[in-house]
């Protein structure tokens, strides 16, 4: 009884060991490791891009100096708030159009306080930033999605070939072989179709030549009969 149990346990252990190291299980483990590595690589790239973009925006915001407000901006600050409160459904572009129209309708006397305030703010700005020159902001160019996708694909392929070179190359060879088989089958079908068309064309020309020979022999046989007819009636009998 003990020997039977031991032999059964050893057999089960061998089966489990063979299953663990079977090609299907190894391929499944390789696929899982490849997906995990590729996701980590993509996440690292996206995190680095976001970090660099955030640092660039922070540096540009710290170094950027705002322009001094002109008379229209000084006037429109308070007026924009009132218009937005009175008409909450209006969009910002519509409010800007309305403010521009109202500013044009103001008289010089009504605009004078705002010009004076703008001159005061300009003097303060010159004292604070003596060497200031207006430089408009440039929008940061985002990397193209296609380039990011290509880099991630290349990274995934490199990781796969580095981790499991034999499995990856075998899969590529199988894919190439299947593509060659499909192209060969297509070329064979094209050759067969062309040969059938040539045969049909040749048979049609053969039948046409046979009909011509038959017609000529028939006309030569009936030629004495046509000579015996009158000149006006011979054309009526030539038609078949």
Swiss-Prot record:
Return the annotated region ranges for Disordered.
37-63
**Major place of localization?**
nucleus
Listed A to Z, the keywords are: Activator, Calmodulin-binding, Cytoplasm, Differentiation, DNA-binding, Nucleus, Repressor, Sexual differentiation, Transcription, Transcription regulation
Q: What GO terms are given for molecular function?
A: calmodulin binding; DNA-binding transcription activator activity, RNA polymerase II-specific; RNA polymerase II cis-regulatory region sequence-specific DNA binding
Which subcellular locations apply to this protein?
Nucleus speckle; Cytoplasm; Nucleus
- Iron as a keyword? no
Functional description taken from the UniProt entry: Transcriptional regulator that controls a genetic switch in male development. It is necessary and sufficient for initiating male sex determination by directing the development of supporting cell precursors (pre-Sertoli cells) as Sertoli rather than granulosa cells. Involved in different aspects of gene regulation including promoter activation or repression. Binds to the DNA consensus sequence 5'-[AT]AACAA[AT]-3'. SRY HMG box recognizes DNA by partial intercalation in the minor groove and promotes DNA bending. Also involved in pre-mRNA splicing.
- Can you state the subunit structure given in the record? Interacts with CALM, EP300, HDAC3, KPNB1, ZNF208 isoform KRAB-O, PARP1, SLC9A3R2 and WT1. The interaction with EP300 modulates its DNA-binding activity. The interaction with KPNB1 is sensitive to dissociation by Ran in the GTP-bound form. Interaction with PARP1 impaired its DNA-binding activity.
Q: What is this protein called?
A: Sex-determining region Y protein
- UniProt lineage: Eukaryota, Metazoa, Chordata, Craniata, Vertebrata
Gene, per the UniProt record: SRY
